């Protein structure tokens, strides 16, 4: 949502090329980080190479989705309305067609690309149907771009989030079943029988509505800092929980023997710890980066002085 909003805004500000470049670089970076987190370094050092590091997780899906959004926007950039409608229709179409690729095995496609389309080889997420959520997010971004300055926009959007979200959660399944009977389309029956995508979208919209409604109370410095460090938090949590590189993480150490109280208490402690680590690591990295840049500038100035 935020990425697409800034992308559309960049056209108005005359910085579209820079924003596109940043988006593509960001997308490729997320894909790269996703693969790196799966590399079993110690196993590789013993000469035991496998293909598990090529499985797809959420970062690769987000990265590829950013690249796809940039490409679609380039095709429809002359009219924001066209881009908005395309993203809404694309998200809906992907969700409706989910039963068609739910069991797709991609047998004739090279493993590297097949993992983006099927979970058969161990992928946690696949680009379909999860790109659908990115498409809906891009559509919502166009609403912010077009109507943010309008009177009562916030009230209207919050109401829309709640109403649409609750309809999707409680009403989408019966609607799909009735439509399937009416037009005799078995695909809608399959969607209704495993309607996790539209229900989850409804939950997301309700949560959006809550966060947007309490926006003024959430603009605390700590909350804003944590919000800016989501990638670092994800990477650190992944390393600690799943044992990236070493293969030994908390899930292997603790297993599934914790009581409900231990799970809740442990989850809170884990979230706080990961957030603090992320904040202080970023601060340390900032100081190191500044120190290196200062030294490089000093060496550059010294070189110029000696040459003169």
Residue ranges and their predicted role:
Residues 1-308:
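Alpha-helical transmembrane segments and their immediate juxtamembrane cytosolic regions
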């Amino acid at each position: 949502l935020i990425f697409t909003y800034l992308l559309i805004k960049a056209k108005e500000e005359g910085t579209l090329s820079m924003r596109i470049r940043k988006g593509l670089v960001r997308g490729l970076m997320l894909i790269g980080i996703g693969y790196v987190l799966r590399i079993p370094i110690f196993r590789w050092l013993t000469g035991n190479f496998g293909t598990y590091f090529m499985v797809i997780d959420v970062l690769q899906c987000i990265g590829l989705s950013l690249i796809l959004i940039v490409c679609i926007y380039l095709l429809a950039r002359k009219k924001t309305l066209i881009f908005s409608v395309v993203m809404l229709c694309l998200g809906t179409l992907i969700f409706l067609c989910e039963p068609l690729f739910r069991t797709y095995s991609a047998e004739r496609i090279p493993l590297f690309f097949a993992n983006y389309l099927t979970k058969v080889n161990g992928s946690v997420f696949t680009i379909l149907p999860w790109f659908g959520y990115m498409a809906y997010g891009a559509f919502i971004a166009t609403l912010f771009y077009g109507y943010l300055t309008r009177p009562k926009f916030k009230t209207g959007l919050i109401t829309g989030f709640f109403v649409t979200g609750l309809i999707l959660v409680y009403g989408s399944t019966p609607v799909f079943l009735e439509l399937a009977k009416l037009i005799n389309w078995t695909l809608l029956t399959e969607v209704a029988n495993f309607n996790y995508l539209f229900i989850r979208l409804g939950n997301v919209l309700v949560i959006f509505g809550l966060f947007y409604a309490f926006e003024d109370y959430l603009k605390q410095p700590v909350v804003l800092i944590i919000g800016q460090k989501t990638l670092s938090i994800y990477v650190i949590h992944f390393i600690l929980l799943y044992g990236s590189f070493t293969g030994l993480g908390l899930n292997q150490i603790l297993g599934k023997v914790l009581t409900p109280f231990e799970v809740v208490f442990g989850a809170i402690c884990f979230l706080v710890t990961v957030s603090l680590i992320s904040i202080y690591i970023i601060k340390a990295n900032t100081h190191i980066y500044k120190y290196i840049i200062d030294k490089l500038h000093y060496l550059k100035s010294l070189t110029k002085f000696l040459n003169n």
